[in-house]
Amino acid sequence: RYTLLTSAIKTCNDNKVYLAQFFRVISQENSADIYQAAKDSDYYIGAVHEDEPANGEELVNILLNKGDRNIGLIGWEQGDATWLGRWEGYKAGVDKWNEEHPDDQAKLSEPQYAGTTSEGGSKAAEALMAADPNLDALIPAGGGGDPLQGAIAAVERAGKTADIDVVSTDFLPDLGDRLENGSMAGESGGHFCDPL
């Protein structure tokens, strides 16, 4: 099978140039031929990528360990692979918690989608707060931080900064201040190196 990545690997092999992939890892199971081409190359050195399910589970665990049980989800775009991976992790974290704590159950909202704007994040947070008066946590995901900023602003306008913990993967420039003043309760993220 000929793909953009197999073409890039071939070009690097032909020209003796090293190649690293960013953001996605080659699946040995789903893309066996591409994986093998990369493995056979002297010049393909690996990928740097996020483990979205692990990251999502970590965010949920931060909230559960803080005592939050009614978690609102704000996604980026419906069907986005990054969002779907994180959502898988959120669900896995809550499922594990509920199995281990049958008398202290947690729940996730259905996601509200914010797009990539602060206004979208604000509207999504407002909708979640209106739908669930017991909401005690929000996880805005994706969009490069703008939806997160909008969600934080909505929580602040509602006077609920002390009542609703906000965690995210998007690192804001003022993250330290936000963690200190309580407008954010935690952060999880990072990348992994995956050499073949």
Indicate where each model-derived feature is located.
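Short beta-strand segments enriched in small/hydrophobic residues
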Residues: 1, 45-46, 70-79
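Short secondary-structure boundary segments
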Residues: 1, 24, 75, 142, ...
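Hydrophobic alpha-helical
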Residues: 1-15, 89-90, 107-178
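Flexible loop/hinge segments that line or gate small-molecule binding clefts
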Residues: 8-54, 58, 76, 172-180, ...
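Loop/turn elements at helix/coil->beta-strand transitions in domains of secreted/extracellular proteins
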Residues: 14-19, 42-44, 66-71, 97-108, ...
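Hydrophobic alpha-helical segments within soluble ligand-binding/sensing domains
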Residues: 46-72, 85, 120-125, 171-175, ...
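Glycine- and acidic-residue-enriched helix-capping/strand-helix junction motifs
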Residues: 79-88
